[in-house]
Amino acid sequence: MLLLCVSVSKIQGGPFAGLEVAAIVPCYNEEVAVGEVIEGLKAAVDGITVYVYDNNSTDRTAEVAAQAGAIVRTEPRKGKGNVVRRAFGDIDADVYLMIDGDATYEAAAAGLMIETLLSGPYDHVLGVRTDDPEASAYRAGHALGNRMFNKLIGRLFGEPVTDMLSGYRVFSRRFVKSFPALSREFEIETELTVHAVNLRIPQVEVPVGFKDRPAGSESKLRTYHDGFRILRLITSLLQYERPLAFFSAVGAFFAAVSVALGIPLLVTYLHTNEVPRLPTAVLATGLALIAILSLVVGLILNGVLRQRQEAARLAYLTYPPVLPPAQTALELAALDRVQR
């Protein structure tokens, strides 16, 4: 099968003239809300190309999206992560905007987020949700879990994050084309955040409005199910992205148990020249060997990680930063003068 990466039409006028800007809207049964999202994006950014990825909806999501002026595509594999992977592979643009199709995010902030990306230039702009006091869209359980995961990611990866589970983001081409997109479901936001933190990609946060879903639409989030999946992903990412710390912690645990079991045996041996409880002595020795082996594995994987990070960084640097059209024109003119 031949897969083609589709280029987005360039914007003809306004502050983003000459740029290819694509909005990606993952949807599952969002016929009530998706039209509002598309209209809001088109009003905020004149000339933006909106792609709605229908994730096996059983309602009229695709029909409503097409009527609102979006390009509709279907991703048969269930899960937001599968949709994002497909969209990032399908679309070739200068700037990518990702927003959920449930109309809870402030689509009117799209222009500001894109301007912020270009002003850095940054490669990742995170829309931080500012909850409407009158709204209940941001459930208490989700808010608490989000704060916990934010602190956990900040502690593990060394960079503070305010809203790592936000579904409203803007990316540069080089962010998107260097992102592996391994997640299948809602943990994709965590993977996006860790990718930016791990490669030390220039990023910034922008506050955006967050409100209730339109009447008649239903949330697809499952607080405990999604929370456990995200926690499992963080553990997996810690294992693969911080192997020395992970396996050192594992080794330290086994070493502590080994010492706790072995010291009484050693004290008895020094007094009696006999080894009591031989099975315990064998267990303590085995745990000590596991501790040493864990440390060795961590050191080896840390070397492998360094090579992976170098390869990922080189893939990221393959693409130039996205710049405002005026700045790009000035740089091209300067380059032309130098060449002459």
Spans of model-derived segments:
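Cell-envelope/extracellular polymer assembly enzymes that use nucleotide-activated donors
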Residues: 20-22, 49, 191
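Hydrophobic helical membrane-anchoring modules
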Residues: 1-16, 183, 188-340
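Short aromatic/hydrophobic "clamp" motif used to bind/position activated sugar donors
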Residues: 96
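The conserved acidic donor/metal-binding loop of glycosyltransferases
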Residues: 100-105
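Acceptor/aglycone-binding surface of glycosyltransferases and processive sugar-polymer synthases
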Residues: 76-90, 107-186, 190, 211-228, ...
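A conserved acidic beta->alpha catalytic loop
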Residues: 54-62
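Short, well-formed alpha-helical segments that are part of the catalytic scaffolds
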Residues: 29-43
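Donor nucleotide-sugar binding loop of glycosyltransferases
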Residues: 30-33, 57, 80, 106
